[in-house]
Amino acid sequence: LGYFRNPRFTAATTAITLVFFAMFGSYFLFTQYLQFVHGYSPLSAGLRILPWALAYLLSATQSAKLVERFGQRAVVASGLAITAVGGGLLALTSSVDASYWWFAIGVVVQALGMGITTAPSTGAIMRSLPLHKAGVGSAVNDTTRELGGALGVAVMGSLVASHFRDSMSTAVQGAPIEASRSLGEALQVAVVTGGSK
């Protein structure tokens, strides 16, 4: 843990954690949003996420040039800000009747930010340690990615599940009595058959 006394090391690991928090949490939600809200098949939903991968690839490969021109700190900070803007666009434009193109714009913006953040942050982790500690740097880099990803899925999944639960209770309250009864009966069937194979 002594490595975290180095501000450069700590800032870089924090940036990686935040990027992978957003990345994995978003992936988790993207696939469900495209399939369950817009009705795309799993394959079709996966293809609709390809703009994210292309934008990430493009920006990640250009990040070294950006660091040379503007400096590592400015590029990483800008990348995190762009990632947040992309996430904000997705939050504001992802609804039942929203066009796929708004979603595509949001994921591209988010991916551009993630791409320019990841490589410089990884480089900063590795450069902040002595050469004989490169294995430690690599392990911490991988661990922070996994930690960020796991937290992203857990937190974003919990937020969506909570919102869904609250929305369903409000929707059921305004539904005709027959609809409310059928939901109760469906729940009973699910409980009874849940353990059977």
Per-region residue spans from a language model:
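Transmembrane core module of solute transporters
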Residues: 1-132, 136
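Hydrophobic transmembrane architecture of multi-pass small-molecule transporters
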Residues: 123-124, 140, 144-197
